[in-house]
Structure formats: C-alpha cells, structure tokens
C-alpha cells in the first residue's frame, strides 16, 4: 500500500527491531482505566472503547507523549466468550465486533499523531479454561483477527497466556494473517500452569510463528526478566532466533506464587503500597536492555510516568527524549527550583538511588502469603459460564477461602 501523500511511511515493527532500535510499549490499560472509573474490576473487559472513547484516547495519548511507539488496541479480554462471561453481557449489549472496531480506530488515531505503530491484541479465553477444543478456541481468536485485518493494524500480539498450548493456538491463528506476531505469556520462572518451562514455551511460540516472544503481567520487573532470560536460553539451545519482549507489572511481587500477583491477598484493590517508583523502572529498563530485550514496556500498574522512565533511561540508545520529559528533570534535577532547601537537596541521582522507601503503614507486614489455590484448566472452579455467578457458588468459594486461609 502506497503511503498517503505528504506522510512519511512508518517503519514496521520488524524493520525497527532489525535495525537495532528499542521499541517501547505502552502500559496497563485495564488497571489505569479502572482507577479512573471506566473499567469494572472483575470482568476487566474493554467496553470503554465504545462507552467512553475519550478516556481510552486520552490514555493512549499520555503513553505516546511518555515515549511509547506502540499503541496496543484496547482489546484485552475482548473475545466474544469473555464479553458474555458470568453475567457480563457486553457482547449482547454492544457486540464484540463494535468493541474491537472502536479500539482499533482509537489506537490508529493516536498512533498517527506520532511515530507509533498499532498492535492488535488477543488474550487467553474462558473457552480454553472450560476445556473447549482447539477448533473452538481458534474460532474465537479469528473473530478478533477479522476486525484487526479490516482495520489494517501494523502487527499482532498474543498476550497474557497462562498455558503455552493456548498461546500457540493464538499465534497460529494470528500468523495466518501474514502480519508479524508477538507472543507474551504471564508466567514466571516456574513456567506455565501445566509445568512447561519458560525456555520450552519460547521454543513452541517461535515454531508456531511468533517473531517476538516474552512475558507480560503477573510478575514484577525483576521476576519477569528472570523468566525472559530462561526463554532466551531456551531459544539459544534450540538454535532459534526471535526478538525478546518484556511488559511486566509495575508492582513489587517477590512474595507471589506461580500464578503471580493474582494469588496475592491484596489483588486487586490493595496493591498501591507495592507500586514501583520511576527509578525502579529506570533500573528495569537498563537491565532489560542489557539482557538483550528490545521491546520494552509494561502491563498492569504501569502509568505514563513509568513509560517515560523507560524512555529516559534508554534515551542514549534511542537518541532522543520523549515530549513528556520537557516537564521532568532527569533524576529529580527539577527539584532545584523548589522553595524548601531540604527538597532542593534531593535534586540528585544518588539521593533517589539510595533511598529506602517507607510504606507509612507501621503495623503492616512487608510480605504477604499467597492464596495459591493451585487450580488451572480443567478444575471445576475454572469452568466458565454465560450466567452470572450464583449466591451458592459464591458461598462455596467463601468457605474454601476460609479453609485455605486456616492452613
């Protein structure tokens, strides 16, 4: 397709990575928009793209200004089966097609305000958890893919998969489009929920057709990079080549179990004390780069200022700062303009690097005990349903939680 007159054609995702460029992803939309009052915690579905497009558009713009050069469509959990799961009924009230189309239109509009690409994204499905067949699950992915092709997204992402089997199905469905495919799993160093190690997960994803592989969500930057390192080693052992990608949480989760932060008792409404600072994220960006990761972004908890931290840390490699850095002094240097002298004394890198941050909660523990129910595909509690969760089903879960907590 010829470029529009007067507009310079953008380099594609693989062209950028082949040239050695650092690609910066965006942050966590469902958490950010839930805090702002546009997404409902629980289903975490993206109907805000239709109901509140201005809110979604503004968040895209803030990530773009912060340094993101990929606008992921706000299509996380936008599969038909998720939009009608457990009494949600979004698919009936709005339709999955409208949600996906609106998300693509918003992402494209903002991407074209800068040098950003649009990535159409799919994620794990209730159908897989309910033991539906490969044919049925792939059909769900193809429904979203039809919209992505119609809207001509630049590349595709299969993200947030706990089971490599389903992730492979997603990659295979997306790869049929002919567009580049990235694939990220929400796993830690222990591997997927069926016990498949990270290295083997990466190998399977690349063999399925993914050009970019890595992790997103569920774990903090440190743990996520441990997992990416294992993926890298697996690919090297298999003599396979792929670009590496990392989009972790912006929460510290050293105490979580195999299922990541969703196992923590603070999930999702008590995570604020765990939020990573901008300086934590600068450290993450440097460590990711040194590991060989060239697609670096974030997931839940990542706000625009976190993305700006990535862009600022990697400005020497990228050759420029993002527009949002106009209002941010490097390592707190802008504090030299403060009225209070003890605040001016904090206008230096050494202060912020060495600060041991207090929580302000004197009687609270620093770590939690994960719930760790250990359920995965095939477990009765994970069988999904179109109807709303019943009071009886909730009572049974409440009793099980009491039992687990007492162990």
UniProtKB/Swiss-Prot annotation:
What does the entry give for GO biological process? amino-acid betaine catabolic process; methionine biosynthetic process; methylation
Sorted keywords for this record are: Cytoplasm, Metal-binding, Methyltransferase, Nucleus, Phosphoprotein, Transferase, Zinc
Residues bound to Zn(2+) are 217, 299-300
Q: How is the cofactor bound?
A: Binds 1 zinc ion per subunit.
Domain annotation Hcy-binding: ranges? 11-314
Q: What is its main location?
A: cytoplasm
Q: Which residues carry this modification: Phosphoserine?
A: 330
Q: Which reaction is recorded as catalysed by this protein?
A: L-homocysteine + glycine betaine = N,N-dimethylglycine + L-methionine
Location comes to: Cytoplasm, Cytosol; Nucleus
Q: What does this protein need as cofactor?
A: Zn(2+)
Pfam families named in the record: S-methyl_trans (PF02574)
Q: Does the keyword Metal-binding apply?
A: yes
The record's listing under InterPro entries reads: Betaine-hCys_S-MeTrfase_BHMT, BHMT, HCY_dom, HCY_dom_sf
Q: Which residues carry this modification: N6-succinyllysine?
A: 40, 93, 98, 232, 241, 340, 377
Q: How does it assemble?
A: Homotetramer.
Q: Quote the function comment for this protein.
A: Involved in the regulation of homocysteine metabolism. Converts betaine and homocysteine to dimethylglycine and methionine, respectively. This reaction is also required for the irreversible oxidation of choline.
Q: What is this protein called?
A: Betaine--homocysteine S-methyltransferase 1
- Source organism per entry reads Mus musculus (Mouse)
